[in-house]
């Protein structure tokens, strides 16, 4: 028998729109299209004034305002599940306790490594970094000022994770965690999270953007222009190509000036800046290949499955979750992360093997339809919600955190 659910979805979005925001919106659209009721509380980091960033980091430990907001919403409706996509920094873990007060199951999607790493990426100074992974107090991150380049702000973030680790929030106030890949699940288990509270469910692309034909012939990069995304490696690889080929770059970020300067000297490379989702889908469908050169442990790499949905194969770093998302030599190619020479070699392969690339287009689209489209993904999400509800019924109610404990 069909059982429609009533879900309260929470998400704190960043100042620059990214994959987490699109993934949250896709799940909301998917659930509603499947007949479930979804209400949202969406907070945007644009509310943060630069002069208050340290204060906001401190507030991330416990936001009474967010607790009251969720408490009030739960009193007004009969919700089955509180699904938190990202609570940092304005919502805070206080929202879990509001749900516990009302006996509502809590699900947290692990869209980043915030609970394991103050700077969220497990990446520092151009290299992977796991110094804080298993530590209750993330003192290496504090020493390096990993959050916004500030030791004080990093200490505030580290205090949040340490406080809630010691209090038992991650263990007792969340009924179920959704990891996007087995790699992410394993990382959180390595950091001490209980394996029986971690399930794997990938991102979804909904609605279906439709399959393109790759007739534009260009290569495409879509993402934040920042060091961990590997855009510098991509530009170095492009300089090594032995023939002319157009590269289109979509996105913005701290490396925007570098990309702009590179484009001024290399007419085959075009920086388009940020673009709306519908336009990005069209660009993907017309591309010969999408390049995903990330140098951090992507929790998923959403743009890869968006590309698969349009039938466009992907060249991705052989790193972390990216090894799981596609199938090498069927939906794209993998290269050694940070190795511009290897990436250039893979780009040449795409140019030299048009028939195989056409076959990859078919397989990429098929993979999307079987693994990343709506029906299977929604089934897995509902199963996760039902698992969380069972766990919630067995859990002891938790009231509001008393001020003397803070």
Predicted regions and their residues:
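Conserved acidic donor-binding segment of nucleotide-sugar-dependent glycosyltransferases
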Residues: 328-329, 333-340, 349-354
